[in-house]
Amino acid sequence: MAASEAAVVSSPSLKTDTSPVLETAGTVAAMAATPSARAAAAVVAAAARTGSEARVSKAALATKLLSLSGVFAVHKPKGPTSAELLNRLKEKLLAEAGMPSPEWTKRKKQTLKIGHGGTLDSAARGVLVVGIGSGTKMLTSMLSGSKRYTAIGELGKATDTLDSTGRVTEEKPYDKITQEDIEGILQKFTGNIMQVPPLYSALKKDGQRLSTLMKRGEVVEAKPARPVTVYSISLQKFQPPFFTLDVECGGGFYIRSLVSDIGKELSSCANVLELTRTKQGPFTLEEHALPEDKWTIDDIAQSLEHCSSLFPAELALKKSKPESNEQVLSCEYITLNEPKREDDVIKTC
């Protein structure tokens, strides 16, 4: 049949008995010559070029992603843990770059190094510092650096976690407490002070986090008080039973313990209702923290360039140690075909 069709197309002397075949072949030839057919062919060719360009673009993005290096900040909302947010960021970047693809997963040495320094509770929001590439080596400096928080405390109620997510363990009256009473005791919590960390924290006993032991219902003994630093603290608002504090502190300081201690000092009790980290090191919530719609390779590259001026050059080579073991440093070395790892919830502020 193929020979006949070829013959029909090339031989106009053949007539009636082969006319259907001649019509079909002729139609195809005619279509190829029409403007619409040429346009269709052009579309197909353009699509092929677009697909090729897309592959090149993805490869370029993947190369750019793996070349990113430095420290930047993201805006952590209430809800996810810091580890969950880091996974979400990682997944968005890998998806944008089309990774992992077969070409990349075969190259097992290609890794995306990403981590965060200074965990925020799931119930807290604010600045979360992220390191990428060799920037992960700089994250330990974030743990010992200064941090600033806005905290809303609630008088008259204590919980086992020292915040509103915990089980209520005690209730006391607060109706006689005045704004002047609160302002009058804040000086006691300023400067170099001793602080007992919360039971629900990343501190460990026999290699296990105290928070994990508490979840199991095990009895956990309080850790001894240790030295911490509060650079400044002020009362921003008082509308009983709620009070708002602005606190700037050093590493290893717990806002939840501060609010609880303030309640006790006032002969009542208190817990943290809302917590926002407004600054960590040189990063501020307003100027530097990227919202989720800016978690793109290009936006992060621009942020890294902008934030590079915030650090002295020698800091990139400095490898400082965390002041204490509850200051969790999460540095993920993500091999592109490595399965996800679930992290426990850790409270560190």
From Swiss-Prot:
Active site: 121
Principal location class: nucleus
Impact upon substituting residue 163 to A: Abolished pseudouridine synthase activity without affecting ability to promote processing of let-7 miRNAs
One cellular component term from this protein's GO annotations in UniProt: nucleus
CDD domains: PseudoU_synth_TruB_4 (cd02867)
Keywords on record: Acetylation, Cytoplasm, Isomerase, mRNA processing, Nucleus, Phosphoprotein, tRNA processing
GO molecular function: pre-miRNA binding; pseudouridine synthase activity; tRNA pseudouridine(55) synthase activity
Highest taxon of the lineage: Eukaryota
Expression sites by tissue: Highly expressed in heart, skeletal muscle and liver. Expressed at lower levels in lung, small intestine, kidney and spleen.
Enzymatic reactions: a uridine in mRNA = a pseudouridine in mRNA; a uridine in tRNA = a pseudouridine in tRNA; uridine(55) in tRNA = pseudouridine(55) in tRNA
EC number, UniProt record: 5.4.99.-, 5.4.99.25
GO biological process: mRNA processing; mRNA pseudouridine synthesis; positive regulation of pre-miRNA processing; tRNA modification
Pfam families to which the protein is assigned, alphabetical: TruB_N
Keyword S-adenosyl-L-methionine: no
Compartments reported by the entry: Nucleus; Cytoplasm, Cytosol
Function: Pseudouridine synthase that catalyzes pseudouridylation of mRNAs and tRNAs. Mediates pseudouridylation of mRNAs with the consensus sequence 5'-GUUCNANNC-3', harboring a stem-loop structure. Constitutes the major pseudouridine synthase acting on mRNAs. Also catalyzes pseudouridylation of some tRNAs, including synthesis of pseudouridine(55) from uracil-55, in the psi GC loop of a subset of tRNAs. Promotes the processing of pri-let-7 microRNAs (pri-miRNAs) independently of its RNA pseudouridylate synthase activity.
Protein family (similarity comment): Belongs to the pseudouridine synthase TruB family.
Protein name: Pseudouridylate synthase TRUB1
Protein source organism: Homo sapiens (Human)
Gene: TRUB1
